[in-house]
Amino acid sequence: MIEYVEGHVVYDNPKPHIHSRHGYFPGLARLNSGELICFFVMGEAFEAPNCTTYISRSKDNGRTWTLQGRFYDNSRLPVPTNDSLKPTVLRDGKVIAMGFRYLRRDPEQGIAIPETNGFQPGENVVSVSDDDGHHWTEPKVIPRKHPELIETSGPCIETQSGELLALGALFKLPDGTNPSGEIGVLMRSPDQGKTWTDDTLFYNWRKITPYEARICEMQPGRLVAIVWAYDAATDRHLPNQVTFSTDGGKTWSEPEDTGHLGQASSLIWLGGETLASIHSHRSTAPGLYVRLIDFSKNRWKPVDEKVIWGPSAGYKGSDGATMAEMFAALKFGQPSLLHLGGDEFLAAHWSIENGQGKIRVHRLRMKA
């Protein structure tokens, strides 16, 4: 059972006639105090050099939000950067922020380089807070064996064994090459983010790129990952794929086609053999889809589905236009799910409405 309860806005530019400020790429976490934090990127355009991570906080389970401010001051760095990080609350109460930043030596170039089909170079970074996200250590660069930047666009997870795991595809180098291949990399830390390895592959299949990878743990050592599968050779977006591990991420299954023609997606464990997933569908019948999944015998079997945002959800924009009228020009993505307790969950995503980048959350009730 999936029930839509209500929607709220985390960030919307209060003065769009004065400043160009857009919100993108949210990530939610629930602190041990019960307070929620939302990381998101704010900048004047989608690939603007001044895009950087901000933090908002909620004391009422996501109904209202207060902007805390910038995650850190990246103007101190020797090279201009823009960054995107996501929070994870550890069992001991510490908060880990993990993500990546692009090096923007030429502010007139975008992140993607059309001439080569490559991307700006970058660094994978991690930071820690021991006061519920009010103060953070200076982001530390994570050494990696791959020359390509790892797309750690989702949060890391803390497994029941105490390890931290994160997933990512590889961005091509600025010259358009990818010497490591079209693979998915698992990053592992045994010491709460102090050191990391990136020598395990969670995905290596038919030269398909596993963008926007997300991971969750079910029973101890049983992991499931979902990806936005992209075939660069044919420029085709394939249905979301999932792969699983039963040994703590050391080895992984071949990917399974879910049949859901989504792009950025995410998933969480509800207990037993049940997962909940959320998908950005941007082609046929666009919108945000939430599904309950029976993952018995490590096979993907949808048992319930609900569109929580999009034309068929009956959503109306602020100007009264239906989503069916707005979706021709609407952009949205990077959805995620957060368990609030009991049968309540919060879904987050970004959207561009009336030319403005917003961060939205939706309260749901779900039962297996």
Question: Which residues are covered by each model-predicted region?
Answer:
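Asp-box/BNR beta-propeller blade signature and adjacent active/binding-site loops
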Residues: 1-368
